[in-house]
C-alpha cells in the first residue's frame, strides 16, 4: 500500500495583539484586556530601560522569556533571566533595564484597574513626565 506523501510543516506567524505601541525603549503589545486584568508582551531593546515608575491602581506580574536585564523594585536591583518571575505590588517603584545585546522580552500580567494613564514616572531617560 502506498504511503501518503507527507507535506512539510509550515507555520505562519500571525499578529494576535489587540493594541500595540512603539516606545523610545522598545515596544509593548497587548494580547488580552478584560475587566480587572490585562496581558502584554514587553520588548526592551538593548541598552534601553523603562522609566522608574509606579502605579496606584494595579499590580503587575512579569515573566522574563528572553534576554536578561536588571530589575529595580523600590531600593533593590536584581538580575533577571529567562524563566525568572517578579511581582510588582500596587505603588511599588519599579523599572527594567536591558544592558545586554539582544532584546529583553517580558510577559506582563496586570491586575486591578488596568489603565495606561495609571503611571507616575519618577525618572525617565526620554523626557516624558
Feature map (PLM): residue ranges:
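Glycine- and acidic-residue-biased ligand/ion/polar-headgroup-sensing regions
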Residues: 57-70, 74-75
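Short acidic-glycine-tyrosine-enriched beta hairpin
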Residues: 75-93
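Short beta-strand segments
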Residues: 50, 76-78, 118-120
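A short glycine-rich, His/Asp/Glu-containing loop-to-beta-strand
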Residues: 15-54, 58, 109
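Short beta-strand His + acidic residue motifs that chelate non-heme Fe in jelly-roll/DSBH
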Residues: 51-53, 71-72, 88, 94-100, ...
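A generic "binding-loop/recognition-motif" signal
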Residues: 48, 57-58, 76, 92, ...
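Double-stranded beta-helix
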Residues: 2, 6, 10-23, 95-129
